[in-house]
Amino acid sequence: MTTLKLNREFLVRHLFALAVFAVLGGWFGFDAFVRYPRTPAAALYESIEKAPPPADMSQAKLDAFKAQKTKTQFVLAIVTLGAALLVALHLLSVAGFKFAFDDDGFVLRGKRFAWGDVKNVDESLWEKKSVLRISGDGWDATLDAWHHVGVKELRERLKSKSL
């Protein structure tokens, strides 16, 4: 039985993106919750703007600058950690998809199907995206060759069954 396996290149790229988003989120979060609140407003202005605050800038304006920059770091932390979460969930979803096939049929979501159970094979996205959609009575599956190794072999098997 041939089992679809997670594409290594897909996995590496998504793990890299996950790491980048997580590190950036941690960095922004550290700035928002630790570094910026502990830094005096004038020193924070100087570290961000690379120049001392103007002489006519009041303490209230410096405090407003600090509050705005802290809020910005907080928002950036939420956005990047949210992106990391979305990448992780997508990766888990793709990794959790199980599909295997042999000469007699295939197993989809733990249920065995015969090749004759396939009622429709949609290859409209194959040339552009290497996506194959198969369906039958009460079930369907979208198989992406970018996500899983073995989809091309499955496509050839479906063609040989002339469905």
Protein language model regions, located:
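Cytosolic juxtamembrane regulatory segments of multi-pass membrane proteins
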Residues: 54-55, 109-128
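Hydrophobic residues embedded in beta-strands of well-ordered beta-sheets
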Residues: 106-107, 130-132
